[in-house]
Design a protein with these regions (language model features):
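Residue-level recognition of tetratricopeptide repeat
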Residues: 50, 84, 128, 165-167, ...
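A structural motif in tetratricopeptide-repeat
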Residues: 47, 81, 118, 125, ...
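Residue at a conserved register position within TPR or TPR-like alpha-solenoid repeats
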Residues: 27, 61, 95, 102, ...
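N-terminal leader/linker segments that initiate helical-solenoid repeat arrays
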Residues: 15-56, 62, 218
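Canonical tetratricopeptide repeat
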Residues: 52, 56-59, 90-93, 134, ...
């Protein structure tokens, strides 16, 4: 009986907490991160191992370019649930952004861990498309002397092609465009559009024409 009465006393608080949490999730989805963050932070103080809340806070920190904060959240998530591919992907992503904004020497010390994080995400989820995209972009953007490799970029692009025609064509187009093979890139983007990527493929093709080939997109 005492336990039942205690439950009744706590019930309004539980409902209120769930209501607040739901509102915070809607604020997050609407991109109102400053309003959502305090609710998630308060909830996490009372539930320090709540994975979803930790992920929300990591995502908010990432959106706000607070790389160090995001790194802390995702690192903790990896420790709490080392089998979740997305935690490694997100950790690698924010670590990569920190590296990009750091000086060259500091960045070099992070690149290895960034790659390993994306590779781990693929190991845990062999169909992880975003991690392969990240590796494609890393390998074409890095100079060869510090680990860049067109061969490895093509390897991951080919893997993408097996998972998704659109992502395979678009990623190969990005590789060709980066190495100034503009006609080849044009063909890859057109293949992506034909495969269904009318928006992203169309935008990439338009940017290629405008910035690299001095052409206009033909209207049907």
């Amino acid at each position: 009986m005492k336990q039942f009465l205690s439950f009744l006393l706590l019930f309004p608080l539980m409902v209120w907490s769930q209501s607040d949490y739901g509102k915070a999730e809607k604020l997050f989805e609407a991109g109102k991160y400053d309003q959502a963050r305090p609710v998630f932070e308060s909830f996490l103080k009372e539930n320090p191992s709540h994975l979803k809340t930790m992920e929300y806070l990591g995502d908010i920190a990432g959106h706000q370019k607070s790389w160090d904060k995001a790194i802390v959240y995702y690192k903790k998530l990896k420790q709490l649930k080392p089998s979740e591919a997305n935690y490694y992907f997100k950790y690698g992503g924010v670590l990569g952004m920190k590296a990009k904004e750091s000086n060259k020497f500091a960045a070099l010390g992070m690149i290895g861990e960034v790659k390993e994080s994306f590779e781990k995400a693929i190991e845990l989820n062999p169909k992880h498309i975003e991690a392969r995209w990240a590796l494609v972009m890393i390998y074409i953007q890095l100079p060869g002397i510090v680990g860049g490799s067109e061969t490895k970029a093509i390897k991951y692009s080919n893997e993408l092609l097996k998972l998704s025609l659109v992502d395979g064509y678009l990623s190969r187009g990005q590789i060709d465009e980066h190495f100034k093979r503009y006609t080849a890139a044009e063909q890859q983007y057109k293949k992506a559009i034909a495969a269904g990527s009318t928006k992203t493929g169309g935008q990439m093709l338009s940017n290629l024409y405008k910035n690299k080939m001095n052409k206009s997109v033909k209207k049907n």
